[in-house]
């Protein structure tokens, strides 16, 4: 692939598809100009109201970069193993074939193994989560 980006963290990634709001149709062709413009933007979230599909390869031994996006995310571990770190001390171990759906949580991905871990992500733009996701009575 010619669109792989090496990140300062040592990880690498590739943007496979991006769509603006209302672009969920199969007729026509990809707007190459809009696609090139999006690839130059910083950040990982899709355009507001849109969606994005990307591949991420986690390098071994790198710490998690904690972040949150206003998205619903589908993550599929394609190769290797990793840990998804959440707020506090919570962690979820994931292996090849595992699928995770998350909704606007603070999280980070960490590869504690000796081999790269490859994940596929689909991020769908969403409203920001409420400040307090866990309400007490």
Predicted regions: what is each one?
Residues 73-74, 99-105, 114-131:
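A short hydrophobic beta-strand segment most commonly corresponding to one strand
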Residues 70-87:
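Glycine- and acidic-residue-biased ligand/ion/polar-headgroup-sensing regions
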Residues 64-66, 84-85, 107-113:
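Short beta-strand His + acidic residue motifs that chelate non-heme Fe in jelly-roll/DSBH
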Residues 88-104:
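Short acidic-glycine-tyrosine-enriched beta hairpin
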Residues 32-42, 51-70, 103-106, 125-127:
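Conserved short histidine dyad/triad with adjacent acidic residue
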Residues 1-52, 56, 137:
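A short, N-terminal "cap"/entry segment at the start of jelly-roll beta-barrel domains
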């Amino acid at each position: 692939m010619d669109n792989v980006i090496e990140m300062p963290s040592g990880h690498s990634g590739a943007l496979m598809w991006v769509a603006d709001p209302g672009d969920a149709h199969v007729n026509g062709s990809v707007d190459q100009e809009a696609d090139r413009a999006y690839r130059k933007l910083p950040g990982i979230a899709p355009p507001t109201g849109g969606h994005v599909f990307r591949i991420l390869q986690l390098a071994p031994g790198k710490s998690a970069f904690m972040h949150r996006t206003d998205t619903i995310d589908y993550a599929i571990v394609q190769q290797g193993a990793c840990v998804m770190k959440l707020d506090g001390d919570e962690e979820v171990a994931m292996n090849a074939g595992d699928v995770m759906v998350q909704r606007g949580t603070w999280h980070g991905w960490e590869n504690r193994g000796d081999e790269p871990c490859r994940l596929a992500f689909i991020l769908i733009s969403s409203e920001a989560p409420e400040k307090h996701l866990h309400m007490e009575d």
